[in-house]
Amino acid sequence: MQCALYDAGRCRSCQWITQPIPEQLSAKTADLKNLLADFPVEEWCAPVSGPEQGFRNKAKMVVSGSVEKPLLGMLHRDGTPEDLCDCPLYPASFAPVFAALKPFIARAGLTPYNVARKRGELKYILLTESQSDGGMMLRFVLRSDTKLAQLRKALPWLQEQLPQLKVITVNIQPVHMAIMEGETEIYLTEQQALAERFNDVPLWIRPQSFFQTNPAVASQLYATARDWVRQLPIKHMWDLFCGVGGFGLHCATPDMQLTGIEIAPEAIACAKQSAAELGLTRLQFQALDSTQFASAQGEVPELVLVNPPRRGIGKPLCDYLSTMAPRFIIYSSCNAQTMAKDIRELPGYRIERVQLFDMFPHTAHYEVLTLLVKQ
């Protein structure tokens, strides 16, 4: 991938950009095999990759500069701003949105937040695009609601320029820290969720729900999990850390009982909406802590699917799964180090199958799917 920002030394986020994709995949595979070296693995599946540029469905832009000349991008460690509107990881459809947002920031009087001075209002611009219909969700992260009336007044102009903006919100983040969003979300549009579709499964994206940033690879990840589950004798499964339900909705069949657990209520609202659309009546989604839910249950499903954040599932849940002993565990991980640590805490299981998904090209990060079978 060619990147003018990297070549000029202005951005170093894609640390592996000079390596061809096959070399990147080899290095990631070697890293994963090294982390799992202590465990016999029955089957290593070929790694899955997608496009090397224009693949991201989300932009998280720090707003800096002045209200007349805002910059959208990031701050270097020394506080120097960098405009990243030309980042080649973004699809071409993002360019006209960034181009319209800059004059809009001036029109609405949204003074960029100055970290050093602790002054200003507009901290971040968060943009998400649906692959299914090109609809977009735009979030303005503000320090307070001081400029809310001005923003509302100026909004019709922006909507006229960008009819693809289906969901527009303001998020209030009052804390002087590098935290992306606060708890308060104010909707400026009637529509509150963005419609997405992977492998004919309807998915919904709401402002405060996690969604994968590489749709091409994420859809293959979900399809692979579905294929693995269909090969197993499963009538009852749990989907823990389920997010908007991507895994569970792909894996479920009409006669399967499935419970999806996620701590974020916004994500659970999305999952329930999808299940209703699919007419799957035996799916239950609940906004709870996954570890607390699991340890409070009496019955044991045949399969537990876990998709934890980077910290992994942790010893308490590993201990409980070991005691409960479901026949199968599918572990989807964005941090193979913590996954390997968790597998060490599950001595009653063997690794049947592992597959690497290159969700984050040009970086050392990757996603991995692992099938564990009770010994």
From Swiss-Prot:
PROSITE patterns: SAM_MT_RNA_M5U (PS51687), TRMA_1 (PS01230), TRMA_2 (PS01231). Catalyzes the formation of 5-methyl-uridine at position 747 (m5U747) in 23S rRNA. Belongs to the class I-like SAM-binding methyltransferase superfamily. RNA M5U methyltransferase family. RlmC subfamily. This is 23S rRNA (uracil(747)-C(5))-methyltransferase RlmC. Keywords: 4Fe-4S, Iron, Iron-sulfur, Metal-binding, Methyltransferase, rRNA processing, S-adenosyl-L-methionine, Transferase. Its EC number is 2.1.1.189. InterPro entries: 23SrRNA_MeTrfase_RlmC, MeTrfase_TrmA_AS, MeTrfase_TrmA_CS, SAM-dependent_MTases_sf, U5_MeTrfase_fam. It comes from Escherichia coli O7:K1 (strain IAI39 / ExPEC). The active site is at C334 (nucleophile). S-adenosyl-L-methionine binds at Q212, F241, E262, N307. One of its GO terms (molecular function) is 4 iron, 4 sulfur cluster binding.
